[in-house]
Amino acid sequence: MLSSCVRPVPTTVRFVDSLICNSSRSFMDLKALLSSLNDFASLSFAESWDNVGLLVEPSPPHTVNTLFLTNDLTEEVMEEVLQKKADLILSYHPPIFRPMKRITWNTWKERLVIRALENRVGIYSPHTAYDAAPQGVNNWLAKGLGACTSRPIHPSKAPNYPTEGNHRVEFNVNYTQDLDKVMSAVKGIDGVSVTSFSARTGNEEQTRINLNCTQKALMQVVDFLSRNKQLYQKTEILSLEKPLLLHTGMGRLCTLDESVSLATMIDRIKRHLKLSHIRLALGVGRTLESQVKVVALCAGSGSSVLQGVEADLYLTGEMSHHDTLDAASQGINVILCEHSNTERGFLSDLRDMLDSHLENKINIILSETDRDPLQVV
């Protein structure tokens, strides 16, 4: 009897171990998940006016088993979040944008925050960081046009300077004894990186010194150089720029491999966005048979991004009445699909990309209730 009781134990242990292993693959620490999300698309790509990143954080430690994707976080969507027991909401649009002076039950956005915290649900928003990203919303929107090459309309700047500091100081030193003194002084300033090389000015051998400086270090460098009139008069100070990124930025200017009629392009866009109707403003002198070769697009609200861009067609979610008139007067066709209709379909692609990026460590689900508030009736 004792022997028969002992035998099942290893099987039970293996079963429990299996559950533990599976469980460990189904959770991520919130901080680790946020780091991975930033690796996927850096929040540094977001516009300066935007409110992105972690907006609501439950008290730590907080682990995430289910990540819930939605374009807009409404109260109806929050009900779905709670029913599906999600731990973190990725809301493309930030539900908190303007500063809140109080958290009460009076407004719907305040209620979202209360319900999230009461139920230990975090809220994260990438918004314009995903607009700019190479694998982001605008690239997804461009997929509906057909074969084309595209580039950002307004390229993003790299998040960091290629070298230490944001200023470069350049000057020549004539004599060996001066060189040793100068090199010793500038190398002793924090936030300065130094390079030097031989240079000839006329018939005179000199040493060219380049200093890459932080803003704080620049003031100390200038203070040192200004004590030597001869050095200071030969000094050049350059303000460095962060380089532009080739595939990252706002909007996309797309050149089709082959021109198509406007009517054909309309059909393609409807299929891609799964819409039965769109709004069209024909450019002056254009018809449905006019050819389209270049498309400028911007998911969401495209007025500021598309303004002044030369193209056969503007594609966006919404544009002001007067901006539409301006574009049409220049012979540019305008297609408007409602704001979130040009964004929401990206979430299906995002789910697949995040599954791969996060190595299937957590469950990722799409909202079934999220939808554009405007309907054609």
Curated annotation (Swiss-Prot):
<feature type="modified residue" description="Phosphoserine">
    <location>
        <position position="259"/>
    </location>
</feature>
<dbReference type="InterPro" id="IPR036069">
    <property type="entry name" value="DUF34/NIF3_sf"/>
</dbReference>
<comment type="subunit">
    <text>Homodimer. Interacts with COPS2. Interacts with THOC7.</text>
</comment>
<dbReference type="InterPro" id="IPR017222">
    <property type="entry name" value="DUF34/NIF3_animal"/>
</dbReference>
<feature type="region of interest" description="Mediates interaction with COPS2">
    <location>
        <begin position="244"/>
        <end position="377"/>
    </location>
</feature>
<dbReference type="GO" id="GO:0061629">
    <property type="term" value="F:RNA polymerase II-specific DNA-binding transcription factor binding"/>
</dbReference>
<dbReference type="Pfam" id="PF01784">
    <property type="entry name" value="DUF34_NIF3"/>
</dbReference>
<dbReference type="GO" id="GO:0005737">
    <property type="term" value="C:cytoplasm"/>
</dbReference>
<feature type="modified residue" description="Phosphothreonine">
    <location>
        <position position="255"/>
    </location>
</feature>
<protein>
    <recommendedName>
        <fullName>NIF3-like protein 1</fullName>
    </recommendedName>
</protein>
<dbReference type="GO" id="GO:0005739">
    <property type="term" value="C:mitochondrion"/>
</dbReference>
<dbReference type="GO" id="GO:0045893">
    <property type="term" value="P:positive regulation of DNA-templated transcription"/>
</dbReference>
<dbReference type="GO" id="GO:0005634">
    <property type="term" value="C:nucleus"/>
</dbReference>
<keyword id="KW-0597">Phosphoprotein</keyword>
<keyword id="KW-0539">Nucleus</keyword>
<keyword id="KW-0007">Acetylation</keyword>
<dbReference type="GO" id="GO:0042802">
    <property type="term" value="F:identical protein binding"/>
</dbReference>
<dbReference type="GO" id="GO:0000122">
    <property type="term" value="P:negative regulation of transcription by RNA polymerase II"/>
</dbReference>
<comment type="function">
    <text>May function as a transcriptional corepressor through its interaction with COPS2, negatively regulating the expression of genes involved in neuronal differentiation.</text>
</comment>
<keyword id="KW-0963">Cytoplasm</keyword>
<feature type="modified residue" description="N6-acetyllysine">
    <location>
        <position position="109"/>
    </location>
</feature>
<dbReference type="GO" id="GO:0030182">
    <property type="term" value="P:neuron differentiation"/>
</dbReference>
<comment type="similarity">
    <text>Belongs to the GTP cyclohydrolase I type 2/NIF3 family.</text>
</comment>
<dbReference type="InterPro" id="IPR002678">
    <property type="entry name" value="DUF34/NIF3"/>
</dbReference>
